[in-house]
Amino acid sequence: MDSSLTGITTTGTPHLGNYVGAIKPAIKLSKKFKSYLFLADYHSLIKVNDPIAVKESSMKIAATWLACGLDSKNSLFYRQSKVPQILELNWILSCMAPKGLLNRAHAYKAAVDLNKENKNDDDYGISHGLFSYPVLMSADILMFNPKYVPVGKDQKQHLEITRDIADKFNKTYKIFFQLPEPIIDESLDLLIGTDGRKTVSYTHLTLPTTSC
């Protein structure tokens, strides 16, 4: 049976971007495929250093997913930090990932460009976590070897990096990972906000569980 995988980073209150880009597609796919859904609490450490805030965000996002119709009987729903094998795989994949590939990651390039604009050293304030974020995302995905991964256009590059790393692993050792295919909803470019206006950036539009 084919499978899909979706995760949400636990950095705050769920917003409309989470709903249209992750929660809604994941629930839809769970009716067709074996689904892996997770709370990406390790990823949140790049932006949030408060463990209480991460825990509260995890609870809110989990509650929102359930309130929006997630059937845990048809899906494996888990917290990233509760699967230690992900970090083990993260190290293995980091040995497969060329630095040049990670240099081209959008988040890292944006941080470098901002430093240049502010006349700072290129890597000023940039953590290794931010730089290697795509490798951990690759480990998240390849740990469960799904066929499909719903992604927004801004995350498509990370899935391409995952495919590149998986392909290199397969060629170095043996064919072990299938190359995950993206599911991209082209309609997500614009969303009608709660104020009735079209918006491209909707991460500030929070989503109470009663809205689902």
Protein language model regions, located:
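NTP-dependent nucleotidyl-transfer catalytic core
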Residues: 1-197
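Conserved small/polar residues in nucleotide/adenosyl-binding loops
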Residues: 203-209
